Amino acid sequence: MKVLWAALVVALLAGCWADVEPESPLEENLEPELEPKRELEQEVEPEAGWQAGQPWELALARFWDYLRWVQTLSDQVQEEVLSNQVTQELTTLMEETMKEIKAYRAELEEQLGPMASETQARVAKELQAAQARLRSDMEDVRTRLSQYRGEVQAMLGQSTEELRARFASHMRKLRKRVLRDAEDLQKRLAVYRAGVREGAERSVSTIRERLWPLLEQARTRHAKVDALATQPLRERVNALGQQLRGRLEEVGSRARSHLDEVREQMEEVQAKMEEQANQMRQQAEAFQARLKGWFEPLVEDMQRQWAVLVEKVQAAVGTSPTTPPVETK
C-alpha cells in the first residue's frame, strides 16, 4: 500500500513539473506584447503635454490620478485590488467627471443664442453621444478591474502570466478608446466654440446692415437741409450728424471689441482642451507601465507555496526530487 502511495506522489510531482516547464516559453511570448505598447507610445507621444483647465478636465484627471495611486501600492497591492474600495472610488470619480462635463456643456449652450436652432440641436446631440461614449469607456475600465479581481481570486496559487498578458492587452485597448473619445469630445466642443464665434460675427454684421442705411439717410437729409436752410440750421444739422456718426462709430467699436474678446476666449478654451488631452495620454501611458508591477507579489507567493509543497512531498516520500522545479517570473 505504501508503495502505491509513493508511486502516486511521484506521478503527481511529474505532472506538476510538466505543467510548470512550459511556463518558460511564456516569457518569450510576452515579448510580442511589448511591440503594440511601443507603437501605442509612439502614437500618444506627440500629445504628451495635456494640462487640465476646465472643471470637467480636472475631474477626468483625478480619475486617472486615482488609478496611478493604486498602481503605486507594493506590499498591500493584492489586498487593495481584491477589495471593493477601488471600484467604489472609480465609480465616484467617474460620476464626478460626468457631472462636470454636463455643467460645462450647459455653460456653452448659454452662449449659443445667435446659432440657428437646428444647428444647435444637431451639435448638442453629437456632443451628448461623445459624452456617452466617454462614460462607457470609463465604465469598461471599472468593469475590467472588477473582472480581474475575480480572476485573481480564482487563480490564487496558480500561474498568472497568461492573465497578466491578457489584462495588459485589455487595458491598452481601453486606454486607446478613452483617449480617442476624449479627442472626439474636444472636437464637439470646438464646434460649439465655432458656433459662438459665428453668432457673434453674425450679430456684428446685422448691426452694420441695419445702421448703414440709417447713416446714408442721415447724410441725404443733411445735404438737403444744407441746400434749403440757413447757416444756423446747417450748423445744427452738422452737429447732429457728427453726434450720430460718433455714436455709430462707438457701437461699431464695441462690437469689434466684443468679437475680439470672444475669439480670445475660444482660443484659450481650445488650448486648455489640447493640453488636457496630452495629459490624459501621458497618464494613461504611465498607468500601463505600472500595471506590470502588480503581479510580482503574486509570483513570489506562488514560489513560496511551491517550496512548501516540495517540502511536504519530500517529507512524505522520504527522498528529495531529482529535478528542481522551474521558477516562474
Swiss-Prot record:
Task: Identify the residues that bind heparin.
Answer: L174, R175, K176, R177, G241, Q242, Q243, L244, R245, G246, R247, L248
Judging by the UniProt lineage, the source's domain of life is Eukaryota
Q: Where are the sequence repeats?
A: 92-113, 114-135, 136-157, 158-179, 180-201, 202-223, 224-245, 246-267
In Swiss-Prot or TrEMBL terms, this protein is called Apolipoprotein E
Q: How is it modified after translation?
A: APOE exists as multiple glycosylated and sialylated glycoforms within cells and in plasma. The extent of glycosylation and sialylation are tissue and context specific.
Where is the region LDL and other lipoprotein receptors binding?
A: 170-180
The record's note on quaternary structure and interaction partners says: Homotetramer. May interact with ABCA1; functionally associated with ABCA1 in the biogenesis of HDLs. May interact with APP/A4 amyloid-beta peptide; the interaction is extremely stable in vitro but its physiological significance is unclear. May interact with MAPT. May interact with MAP2. In the cerebrospinal fluid, interacts with secreted SORL1. Interacts with PMEL; this allows the loading of PMEL luminal fragment on ILVs to induce fibril nucleation.
Segments for region (Homooligomerization) = 278-329
Pfam (any one)? Apolipoprotein
List the residue ranges of the region (8 X 22 AA approximate tandem repeats).
92-267
The answer to whether keyword Glycoprotein applies is: yes
Which interval of the chain is the signal sequence? 1-18
* GO MF entries: cholesterol transfer activity; heparan sulfate proteoglycan binding; heparin binding; identical protein binding; low-density lipoprotein particle receptor binding; phosphatidylcholine-sterol O-acyltransferase activator activity; phospholipid binding
Positions bearing Phosphoserine: S159
Chain positions covered by the region annotation Specificity for association with VLDL: 290-302
Phylogenetic classification of the source organism:
Eukaryota, Metazoa, Chordata, Craniata, Vertebrata
Natural source organism = Zalophus californianus (California sealion)
Family to which this protein belongs: Belongs to the apolipoprotein A1/A4/E family.
Q: Provide the function of this protein.
A: APOE is an apolipoprotein, a protein associating with lipid particles, that mainly functions in lipoprotein-mediated lipid transport between organs via the plasma and interstitial fluids. APOE is a core component of plasma lipoproteins and is involved in their production, conversion and clearance. Apolipoproteins are amphipathic molecules that interact both with lipids of the lipoprotein particle core and the aqueous environment of the plasma.
- Which GO biological process annotations does it have? acylglycerol homeostasis; cholesterol efflux; cholesterol metabolic process; chylomicron remnant clearance; high-density lipoprotein particle assembly; intermediate-density lipoprotein particle clearance; lipoprotein biosynthetic process; melanosome organization
**Sites of Methionine sulfoxide modification:** M155
Q: Where in the cell is it found?
A: Secreted; Secreted, Extracellular space; Secreted, Extracellular space, Extracellular matrix; Extracellular vesicle
Q: Where is this region: Lipid-binding and lipoprotein association?
A: 222-302
Which keywords fit this entry according to its UniProt record? Chylomicron, Endosome, Extracellular matrix, Glycoprotein, HDL, Heparin-binding, Lipid transport, Lipid-binding, Oxidation, Phosphoprotein, Repeat, Secreted, Signal, Transport, VLDL
Q: Which GO terms describe its cellular component?
A: chylomicron; extracellular exosome; extracellular matrix; extracellular space; high-density lipoprotein particle; intermediate-density lipoprotein particle; low-density lipoprotein particle; multivesicular body, internal vesicle
